[in-house]
Amino acid sequence: MRIIAKRTLQNFWEEHPNSKQQLLSWYQVFDKNIFDNSNAIKLIFGSADFVGNNKVVFNICGNHYRLIVKINYVTQIVYILFVGTHTEYDSLKDIKNL
């Protein structure tokens, strides 16, 4: 899959170095695979939450950080919408409309 934009992840792990390994692992899995549907993602990322409108929330470093992406399964593009601390995630008003 094509991921837009890796730089968002890099900026985050520069501020939060303990997130780097897990964000890189997440990136590599999506970069090297084709996911046709949410079930395929759930097989690899069992704790992923599907919040509607093709948006998925991933726990990073246990539950310390959150990553929200939007996936276009037809074009195989993943858009990074949010990466932040759990506290920042909790302050989001409406995940479905990110």
Each PLM stretch: what is its role?
Residues 1-64, 72-77, 86-98:
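Basic, Lys/Arg-enriched alpha-helical interface segments
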